[in-house]
């Protein structure tokens, strides 16, 4: 795969750190596949540099940006506008220009539901682990689908309570999470992500073995099987990792930026192969 030497349009991802991101591979592959004269780069931006970066990006030929941890909420007041779905989610993961206005959107809700809808089963109760930008998108998706029995928990109890009040769901202390009855458990935390946190998990394995099997959904896609998912699968639970969500939300970003559709199956295979090879 080659990147154009002089791209007509520049895109990128901002977050900190960014070592695990597959977004440059996905979007540059899409540009090449569809003959787009554009390029996508990684921009590691520390939290204290976010406002300065956004200011600089406005003056540079940057046509759009992906936004990841820890900037999904912090970036919102720095924008000219946000879309209704980003407003509903309370977080932004996509920046684009709309009539000259730097606008924030959220494709995580779409991405989260894409594989969940494919499962074809309804769930009675959900436990959402974490209270960051991804958790906002998950709660927006679940409540939009009419799911009433939803519980959120986070190490920072204040953040969880604010999130629970925003979406009208239940909140429990992090120390009480193992007592929650749920047949859908979603990990939105970075616990288990490749790197220093790979050996960590947000739930004790006993959680899964002590209740009827349901669905464990980890938004992490690298590694493909976290300790969280391995524990659930060992107890007979169905599992989903974050690969399909990642590809779906990225394809939706591509559509927003370029007005064209990425072939989902090919994009998924690209990322899966890259992860398997350790790229």
Swiss-Prot record:
This is Shikimate dehydrogenase (NADP(+)). Its EC number is 1.1.1.25. It is an enzyme of class 1 (oxidoreductase). It comes from Oleidesulfovibrio alaskensis (strain ATCC BAA-1058 / DSM 17464 / G20). Keywords: Amino-acid biosynthesis, Aromatic amino acid biosynthesis, NADP, Oxidoreductase. InterPro entries: Aminoacid_DH-like_N_sf, NAD(P)-bd_dom_sf, SDH_C, Shikimate_DH, Shikimate_DH-bd_N, Shikimate_DH_fam, Shikm_DH/Glu-tRNA_Rdtase. NADP(+) binds at residues 130-134, 219, 242. One of its GO terms (cellular component) is cytosol. It holds the Pfam family Shikimate_DH. Involved in the biosynthesis of the chorismate, which leads to the biosynthesis of aromatic amino acids. Catalyzes the reversible NADPH linked reduction of 3-dehydroshikimate (DHSA) to yield shikimate (SA). GO terms for biological process: amino acid biosynthetic process; aromatic amino acid family biosynthetic process; chorismate biosynthetic process; shikimate metabolic process. It catalyses: shikimate + NADP(+) = 3-dehydroshikimate + NADPH + H(+). The keyword Transmembrane helix does not apply. The keyword Oxidoreductase applies. One of its GO terms (molecular function) is shikimate 3-dehydrogenase (NADP+) activity. Shikimate binds at residues 21-23, 68, 93, 108, 221. CDD domains: NAD_bind_Shikimate_DH. Belongs to the shikimate dehydrogenase family. Homodimer. Pathway: Metabolic intermediate biosynthesis; chorismate biosynthesis; chorismate from D-erythrose 4-phosphate and phosphoenolpyruvate: step 4/7.
């Amino acid at each position: 795969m080659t990147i154009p030497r002089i791209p007509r349009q520049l895109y990128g991802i901002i977050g900190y750190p960014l070592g695990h991101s597959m977004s440059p591979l996905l979007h540059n592959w899409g540009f090449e596949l569809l003959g787009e004269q554009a390029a996508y780069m990684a921009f590691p931006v520390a939290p204290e540099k976010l406002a300065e970066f956004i200011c600089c990006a406005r003056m540079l030929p940057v046509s759009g940006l992906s936004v990841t941890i820890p900037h999904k909420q912090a970036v919102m007041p720095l924008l000219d506008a946000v879309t209704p779905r980003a407003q509903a989610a309370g977080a932004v993961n996509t920046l684009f220009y709309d009539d000259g206005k730097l606008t924030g959107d959220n494709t995580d809700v779409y991405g989260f539901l894409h594989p969940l809808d494919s499962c074809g089963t309804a769930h009675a109760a959900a436990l959402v682990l974490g209270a960051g930008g991804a958790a906002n998108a998950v709660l927006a998706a679940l409540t939009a689908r009419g799911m009433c029995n939803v519980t959120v928990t986070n190490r920072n109890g204040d953040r969880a309570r604010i999130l629970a009040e925003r979406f009208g769901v239940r909140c429990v202390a992090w120390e009480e999470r193992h007592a929650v009855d749920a047949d859908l458990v979603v990990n939105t935390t970075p616990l288990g992500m490749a790197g220093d946190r790979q050996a960590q998990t947000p739930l004790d394995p006993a959680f899964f073995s002590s209740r009827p099997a349901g669905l464990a959904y980890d938004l992490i896609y690298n590694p493909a099987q976290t300790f969280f998912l391995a524990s659930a699968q060992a107890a007979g639970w169905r599992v989903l990792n974050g690969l399909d969500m990642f590809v779906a939300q990225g394809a939706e970003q591509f559509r927003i930026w370029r007005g064209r559709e990425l072939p989902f199956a090919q994009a998924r295979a690209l990322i899966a192969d890259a992860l398997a090879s350790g790229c």
